[in-house]
């Protein structure tokens, strides 16, 4: 995932055959030399051969410590649906103006989100809030908070993630 654009490209596809059961693994290597660790996130997805477009798992791996990342400024927000779904869950739409990492949603409403602390390219993503008990739409919407990594970094946000020019400073 390129921070500047949100573009995703495939670096490698590896076919593996694993035995059934827990504790099975396969090792392989992927050439990461074409990536700048400060401007990219490695997305690792696992798919079954019978359903290649349905991920079984998705892992997001930083290639550099968070403090070394050059993330763009991102405005991230979320909106709660006006009504609960038939099963009692509530749709939450998350929007980001730029790539954002560790997008985290919190609320005082009792329950959990279908995903949290995730990487998000620019655009929109639908999550589900799973309440404990009766959904409290008003409480969920009123207390919903969305945070992400970039505002907590100590250096200025990257204007262009591929820029090698030093940042100007005022004296």
Question: At which residue positions do the language-model features occur?
Answer:
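Intrinsically disordered, low-complexity Pro/Gly/Ser/Thr-rich segments with frequent PxxP/GP/PP motifs
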Residues: 1-42, 110-137
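Extracellular and select intracellular beta-sandwich modules with Ser/Thr-enriched
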Residues: 10-12, 55-63
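Short, aromatic- and glycine-rich surface loops/edge beta-strands on solvent-exposed regions
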Residues: 36-55, 136-157
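Asparagine-centered strand-capping/turn motif at beta-strand->loop junctions
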Residues: 93-98
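Short, hydrophobic/aromatic beta-strand segments
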Residues: 100-107
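Mature N-terminal, pre-catalytic/accessory segment of carbohydrate-active enzymes
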Residues: 160-166
